A protein has these predicted regions:
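Active-site recognition of the HExxH zinc-binding catalytic motif
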Residues: 1
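Beta/coil-rich, acidic/histidine-enriched accessory regions frequently appended to metallopeptidases
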Residues: 84-264
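Short, glycine/acidic-rich hinge or "gate" loops at secondary-structure transitions
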Residues: 5-7
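Active-site-proximal alpha-helical
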Residues: 11-133
Length: 265
């Protein structure tokens, strides 16, 4: 994933959640905001991690071979999408997941940009127009809220293959040492697309039960979101694309979404 992103999850979080972008409009470091379809797949896999691996709603564990995604597929198989736009279909997926899970998933899908207005032509196995307006979003929210689903008590947007076991027990964060930072200059891209960043390498030691680290500037704007798993090592390191400044905030995020500030030396 390069010098900044520890893995695909970190890249997806930083390119969609941190930027507040529509799900269809992934933003990468550098000049080349390429359409990274693998980053866009992350929230779909997170639903399987949580409902399947954490809650056991998967054909691998259910005696009837049912589960969350089998029911979503059955919903889609029986749904008449005739005349619906791609934006309407995207929002209907949010509704279907909330209805089938019995949970209100608006917060999850909002953070992943499914409920962010967009009007864009996508080129993914053919060119199609994706349009989602604020009026469409407002109507969808009313529809989902009317289901009366349970609100999530976990930071579902931050579950990953390396942390899903924590979502079964929801342990509190165990604090470690103060973080440190050191200057790091790096280049993203090559040729005319090359961009050089004067950044910082952040080092965090002996913090456990952390699902992600969030770095924000003095205004509260995201700089980077990085995966927090540190097994088998007790040390986490990652690089931000700017120099560390007074007023910046480094937070450790728990399974339940609790944020604990990490002092920086």
């Amino acid at each position: 994933m390069g010098i900044t992103y520890r893995n695909r999850y970190s890249k997806a979080w930083s390119g969609i959640i941190a930027t507040g972008s529509p799900h269809a409009d992934f933003q990468n470091l550098g000049k080349n905001n390429a359409n990274d379809v693998f980053c866009k797949l992350v929230p779909f896999w997170q639903l399987e991690l949580y409902f399947g691996k954490v809650l056991g709603r998967t054909p691998l564990q259910q005696a009837d071979k049912g589960g969350f995604y089998p029911e979503v597929y059955e919903y889609a198989r029986n749904k008449d999408y005739t005349g619906m736009t791609h934006g309407e279909i995207q929002l209907d997926f949010v509704y279907a997941c909330s209805k089938i899970s019995g949970m209100n998933l608006l917060d999850f899908f909002t953070k992943w940009g499914f409920l962010t207005p967009v009007d864009k032509e996508l080129d993914d196995y053919g060119k199609k127009q994706l349009t989602v307006t604020q009026d469409m979003i407002d109507a969808l929210k009313q529809k989902v809220n009317a289901l009366g689903g349970t609100r999530l008590d976990v930071a579902l947007e931050y579950i990953s293959d390396n942390t899903y076991e924590l979502y079964k027990t929801k342990p509190a964060i165990i604090k470690g040492e103060n973080a440190t930072h050191a200057p790091k200059t790096f280049t993203v891209g090559s040729g005319d697309n090359a961009v050089t960043y004067n950044g910082e390498t952040i080092t965090i030691k002996n913090w456990t039960n952390v699902v992600t680290y969030e770095v924000k500037d003095e205004t509260g704007k995201f700089i980077l979101i990085c995966s927090g798993e540190n097994a088998p090592s007790s040390v986490d390191t990652f690089t931000i694309p700017v120099r560390w400044k007074d007023g910046f905030r480094l937070s450790a995020v728990s399974v339940t979404g609790e944020r604990i500030d990490i002092p920086m030396n």
